[in-house]
């Protein structure tokens, strides 16, 4: 009798279930380190459980946010520097939650690739866990998708989903009024927006990712991969102190587009651009691309990653509290009658 022909396996089609299982086991300790009050289940179930009552909430309202890190991923992939891209993913979600007045509670990630490389994926997800731990947010689940034929070799994509809560009636923005002051919290560089433009500028410059950064510091690739700052704990401390009327996360759209999102109809903002120094990375991008200042202001954070809108009589107290939490705090402007954002002074 002829030997029976071996049948096709899932691995033959390019999906390695054993690699997926190995990844889950490898990242379990990192996920476990993010556990917080309310965490009920660990990784591996069909769904993840979270107990709002155990987290201390009486009459909670849930807030959800989802995001990615855009084409910053391309730099991480091309340089092999993937250890902090997970921090970016978490920051893009939890910083948005805080702007609603919510405390981040738990996080789920989606990691997709053509061929799962366990060591690479573990580095990425350990970065996600680091961001979660720094935000008091539990990493309670996720999805790893190995999809042959969908991605070029070595490529991957990331998405994150975060849920937070606040007690009913504590949502932001709330009480924003003419005369409120704007406190700017320093950014850590470009953060996670505008990277299609950044990559185009690097292409125009003729520099490689391993070249020294023209604006100082490490290699160009590493400098541009500086992770997005997490503002959660310090922003929540300010909110709980009272006097904070709104928070604006400065992401895609820059100062020009993001601040109006938290201002009620009939109110605008005046920002003094001479109040802070434009970080060198933005000056280099603008000069290399001959970028006009208005375009810069509606593309990048320009050194201000979060704006805190505060009652004028509480501004000094809130600024001191934020500084004590390690923030670089700058009074950058005020709320005025009108619409949109107007600027005094120059950055460039």
From Swiss-Prot:
UniProt xrefs under Gene3D superfamilies: PurM-like C-terminal domain, PurM-like, N-terminal domain
Naturally occurring in which organism (per UniProt): Cereibacter sphaeroides (strain ATCC 17023 / DSM 158 / JCM 6121 / CCUG 31486 / LMG 2827 / NBRC 12203 / NCIMB 8253 / ATH 2.4.1.)
Cellular component aspect of the GO annotation: cytosol
Protein name in UniProt: Phosphoribosylformylglycinamidine cyclo-ligase
Domain of life according to the entry: Bacteria
MF terms (GO), sorted A to Z: ATP binding; phosphoribosylamine-glycine ligase activity; phosphoribosylformylglycinamidine cyclo-ligase activity
Pfam families: AIRS, AIRS_C
Chain's gene name: purM
Annotated localization: Cytoplasm
